[in-house]
Amino acid sequence: MSSLISRLRKLFKSRNTHDFSNLCKENYQTLLSSEEGKILLGIYHFLSGEPQKAEELLSQVSENSLNSAQGLSDLGLLYFFLGRVEDAERVLKKALKFSDVDDALYARLGALYYSQGKLEEAQHYWERALSLNPNKVEILYNLGVLHLNKGELEKALDLFERALRLKPDFREAEEKKTLILLSLNRIDELVEEYYRELEKNPNEEVYIKLGNTLYTAGRLAEARAVFQEGAEKFPHDPRLKLGLIEVLKEEGRTYQAGTLLKEWLEDTSWVDEEKTPNKDEFLMQMRFRLNELRIQASFLDTAEKDLEKVENKEDYPEYYILKSKILMERNKGLEAADLLREAKERFPAHLGVLQELVHVLTSIGELEEAKEIQSQIVAINPSAVIQQVEMEDYKATDEQIQVLETLLNSPAVPKQTRASAGFVLHKVLEKRKDYDKAFEVLIKANELVKEEINYDWREHRFMIQRTIEVFTPEVVERLKGRGHPSKRPIFVLGMPRSGTTLTEQILGSHSMVYPAGELPFVPKIVNLIPKALQYVGKEPKEWPEAILEFDERLLKSAAQYYLDRVAKLDSEHPRIVDKLPHNFDYVGLILLMFPNAKVIHLKRNDLDVAVSNYQQNFAAKHGTMGFAFDLRWIGHMLNDHRAIMEHWHKLFPGQIYELDYQRLTEEPEEVIRELLEFCELPWEDRVLEYYKTKRPVKTASIKQVRKGIYRSSVEKWRRYEKYLTPVIEILQEGFKKLEDPEIEKYQDKVIPKGLVGYTVG
């Protein structure tokens, strides 16, 4: 028994949870015969997502029968996993009195205090752990992060450098080191040092260090050039190839990244067995990355076919994660959840699986189960406080607030993480009604994002300006009624955060309606139009001028393209809802393609929309959704929105239903009856309980729509009125056409990118 217990502890401490779990299952009955065995089985059950079974085993353990630091240390860890922090602290401290104390006990005490924001206590115990095991890179790294959070950059730098001397390929430590040098204004020194080294001895290691440093510093164009040159000079080194892919992904160059991955996978002669000892495993990971990019680009069928061809696919957590993403894109949230639950059984401590499962469960309204799994994530990774506070509906302890403030204000923490902490902290402070501090934090979070994106409001203004000029009554009259007669699509559109998700969920709870979410098909049609024109022998004009070349054949062809793709998502319901908010840019095209389609436009108080957008950490921040991170940019987008919708109403009188968000919150049944009547749908009582549906919600409104209709967001802007001068000034300015010199700059940027999807990051 003692050798089995020792072996299990060794596996667990080395983070080999897969073998740890298998060994527990193989020796389950044997382990039940001892107190220490029951504790280890409790840990196994917790990692397997079965906290109730862990609690049952814990209740059978007699703490007084444990007479070793090891046994008490495991018991304290199990208490910690189950959220019984006071018991965990008491038992772990009791273990200190025994002679067999090891570095793991001190490390666990450090993690316990760190998770509570008690940095001094955490530092004390992690330093004790390090004194027993000076070469433990994980403890060096944790201490480095702790000193970062305390603002002690030089101490943190020393610890990360020590970790890197022991483990040169420790990427996380390398990133932290770079961030510290960046915050100390010493990044140029490091970059110059690497460039000099590259001139003297241009080897793979220097290319990798330089590329990673530039990437972490946000100098993406330089990083891309370095990785590209390195990959060409050293084609057999996989790290340079992967570095290039990561930079391309960060730059939003999805197509280029996917093309390279496809080339490298089709011809694997570049793989050197010495440099890539696990060749098959490495190529499999590249294959998963390619399919991830395919899913992002909405090539779902291609990705799915390739994933199903993977041999022994059940042995890869990535297979489950990517397959669940495909299911979510197809609005099959329940299937995605079941698949990920199966993955959790096989990989109980895989953070990627657990995080994806939390996301899916939240989207289908299984909030209690999502909270349980989030607690497992925090137990495995105590720094996941941002997600933990989100799951607790932004109710945070004082210690958690301190951690969030530290993350937000630490210049050595990645900007993306700092911004995420800021957006969450804003919601926490808003919930506490500390509105002034909340908005100050929100400004800081948005400014951090702005430093990372390249957005110009004039690009969208120019497209709207040209659309208004091109879509004349004469053009509409020539094409009116020539599109596809289908009544199947219902388009819900308007400014992001105006109530489009709520409206989709109401309609989607009707038995005749399938809520498809934010479909990319209308923007895709717009992007494909030049090729379509060329194919039929017409001048390949870009949008919106392309509408001048349209005829009945092209309209019906575009509509059929849309209907074919919708049919792959659902073939059972007679109606389907497409709720891509920014389809307001393309209402003219939609109503010409589908003259019998229903178009529902959400209108909401401009300032409420402005505040709500500014409060969201949108994932699609590199595209058109970049407008949401600056109050003036939001004002310009609101002006664009108002101008184009006024134009569509003039061209298509009576064909667009105006749904007032405030009226919906005040008179829900009356408004919903009008909505169903407009959509030619019979009344069903179930539409009033839309929030009970298990269909997934994938947008920024993921939590709100699970609570039913609520009025707390109406007139919300008044809390922050004194901060809204920038957006108010732009709204008063109204929609102004760009002048000729400005037009020259933007005439090649016709289609704004990133319209598809605006989920929260």
UniProtKB/Swiss-Prot annotation:
TPR repeats: 35-68, 69-102, 103-136, 137-170, 172-203, 204-237, 351-384, 419-452
Regions annotated as coiled coil: none
Cystine connections: none
Stored SUPFAM superfamilies: P-loop containing nucleoside triphosphate hydrolases, TPR-like
Keywords annotated in UniProt: Repeat, TPR repeat
Record carries keyword Nucleus: no
Domain of life of the native organism: Bacteria
Record bears the keyword Transferase: no
Family from the record: In the C-terminal section; belongs to the protein sulfotransferase family.
Listed PANTHER family: CELLULOSE SYNTHASE OPERON PROTEIN C, TPR REPEAT-CONTAINING PROTEIN MJ0263
Name recorded for this polypeptide: Uncharacterized protein aq_1088
Naturally occurring in which organism (per UniProt): Aquifex aeolicus (strain VF5)
